[in-house]
């Protein structure tokens, strides 16, 4: 799943692997810029390990809807684990 060996992408890979997508086919994607796409908004993790990541695109109902163009970005910031995580929209 990793497209690059940079630490940022490795961190995002761990985050993506922690997300369960029981419905349909997940559209989790990573690019070299360190961005991630999740299958559903509900799939956003409760925590992000050692990373500050901006999620700019959320796929819904089998379709892809780019929310970054509307300025509706979601940033998840965490310290070292789920207990110290904060989520800001």
From Swiss-Prot:
Superkingdom to which the source organism belongs: Bacteria
* SS bond list: 27-59
Region described as Disordered: spans on this chain = 61-89
- Enumerate the InterPro entries for this protein: Tuberculin (IPR022015)
Tell me which UniProt keywords the record has, alphabetically.
Answer: Disulfide bond
What more the UniProt record tells us is: This protein is the most potent component with tuberculin activity so far purified and characterized.
The free-text function statement in the UniProt record for this protein reads: Tuberculin is the soluble, proteinaceous cell substance of the bacterium, to which infected animals become hypersensitive and react characteristically to dermal injections.
The protein, known as = Tuberculin-active protein
Record the organism: Mycobacterium tuberculosis
């Amino acid at each position: 799943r990793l497209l690059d060996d940079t630490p940022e992408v490795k961190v995002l890979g761990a985050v993506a692997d922690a997300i369960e997508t029981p419905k349909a086919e997940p559209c989790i994607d990573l690019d070299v810029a360190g961005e991630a796409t999740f299958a559903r908004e509900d799939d956003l993790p409760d925590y992000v390990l050692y990373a500050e990541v901006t999620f700019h695109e959320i796929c819904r109902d089998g379709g892809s809807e780019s929310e970054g163009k509307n300025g509706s970005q979601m940033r998840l910031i965490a310290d070292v684990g789920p207990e110290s995580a904060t989520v800001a929209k």
